[in-house]
Amino acid sequence: MIMGNLELFLIAVGLSMDAFAVAISKGLSMRRMSYKTALITGLFFGGFQALMPLIGFLLGTRFESYITAIDHWIAFILLSLIGLNMIKESRGPCEIIEDRFNLKDMIILSLATSIDALAVGITFAFLHVDIVPAVSMIGVTTFLFSFLGVKIGNVFGECYKARAELAGGVILILMGLKILLEHLGFLG
């Protein structure tokens, strides 16, 4: 399946919303906005968000022959579960991200916000998505959202965090539904 740039961009935006929400929290915890912190946050989150779908893609291509008959269902289920979880998290209590900025914390936060990208990478393998442009778009989009999230969190505060996760969840569910409907022949 050829996935267009718009579809890849929408998936990239959906995936970047967890990182965006955490970046907003980082910005909230800062007394004064630091562009260095925003840049490092964007690089960590964008880098991990690009790496994880690549790993998922490599795993998916390895096992593709075993599950080709149900790949569209797997894509639909994975994207929907990720999306539903993001929507659920958008309605829950706010997590406080401490104003700590060290390598260990950044790696943990980067992994936590990019686990769903691993599952998306697996679906990319089943859909034969050209992985280099896909991970590039995901990484750059997440970098930009994370960089801006630190600034937005520092300036505006908590009100955007839940909305970002809700929007990201809805986008991923819609993309999963689109993939399923295409494979079932309901969409051209």
From Swiss-Prot:
GO cellular component, one term: plasma membrane
UniProt name for this protein: Putative manganese efflux pump MntP
InterPro entries in UniProt: Mntp/YtaF, Put_MntP
Annotated function: Probably functions as a manganese efflux pump.
Main location: membrane
Protein's membrane topology: Multi-pass membrane protein
Family: Belongs to the MntP (TC 9.B.29) family.
